[in-house]
Amino acid sequence: MHVTRHIRQWTMPLLLAICMSATAQSIREEIELIPQRSAGIRYSLPTNEQLTDTPVPDGKKPFYISHYGSSAAYYLDNTKDYTGPLSTMAKADSLDKLTPLGQDVLHRLELIYKDAKLKVGELTEKGAQQMRQLAQQMVDRFPEVFVKGSIVDGRSIVRNHNILSMQEAMIQISRACAPMDLRIKSSHSNDAWMYVRDKDLEADRYNEETEASYQAFRMANKDDDRLMNLLFTDADYVKKHVDSIILSDQLFVVANTIQDTPLADQVTLYDLFTPDEIYRHWRIHNARTYISYGRFALNGTYQAYSQRAPLWNLLHMGDSVKNIGHPVVHLRYTTRGMLTSLICLMELNGYGLVTADLDQLDKQGWADYRIAPFGASVQVIHYRKDMDDDDILIKVLLNGKETRLPIESDCAPYYHWQDAKRYYLRKLYAYERLKYENETKKQKK
């Protein structure tokens, strides 16, 4: 990735206009141009885009990088994700119920499963390469931080692909830089601020009203009859023995997984779907991501608050490193779902969108492949002139790009650390107060 530094005016109104221009039509065009984007959070963040950095005000230099990222591309976690559609098609074939295209699709599914069956949940080779490239980009972009004597601390949740992603990144950094203090840890002791589950919020995630809204949206966007007619010779057999909604979705999910495997240039399933069908499938998955990790009005708008502990950690560590006399890098590798919630909680680029209308998501530019694809990250870069400089500035990068925060700044995309910290602390304390009040009311009943 080539990084250029340039001088430009960055204002809140301009950024808001850019954000609001992300209409449903532009998202649809993006997906039609690159169908792999329909994979949503399984789309791989490109590593060949040219990024730009606005010059830092007042000659300040980066001294601390606080990073929360997801793993790079990996195979599906569950063998049944591969065997489900395969068994449905194989059974139909044994009864002579497949069209020639259906038989060809069965053969493709067999090839895909053969490649994946012993690698379920593992990092793909392309994923490993992606993580090395992203690490190198960070080094190239902030050379002042990766110097002799710097501390680079890598932490991962206890998942195979997260551990390997962290490992690939740290190996690349060690190769590219002068001797540094490199530390790696993967432990459940990190779960309190890296793999956070809030059972109370999860219990409300798909309440009755939310489930009804999602199912209505899902049915409005489903159109599986054409595909079933292409694959099967007997409509009556399909009606009695095939769940067309499930099979269509299974084929779509598998289609999206191929892009990061050795079969990417050999096999596709996208040809089974029209551009409109691909877009509709993506809308359904995007809506589910939003309901689960965003700020959907019908389940209370608070699902993103499940990741308040990581935000507390970002704020705490930002103050803790100020008195350290050498650069520090904290790299944390968690899930894309949890990263999505953190991004929504921080309201980066307006992704803290609150709506009860799932049709509004793409119209408002809320697209999961833009938010937390494979290799996604939130990087908070801290800047100062020297250790006596109390006016620390931060810049937040979302997936490598300069990002708008929900606060005013006289030097955006840079923000005064004290302003950002104050805003987020108030937000977190307000939620804790609301939670306490609700618990008190329950106890009085």
Q: Could you say what each language-model-derived stretch is?
A:
Residues 1-27:
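Bacterial Sec-dependent N-terminal signal peptides
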Residues 25-153, 157-330, 334-445:
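Signature for phosphate-centric chemistry
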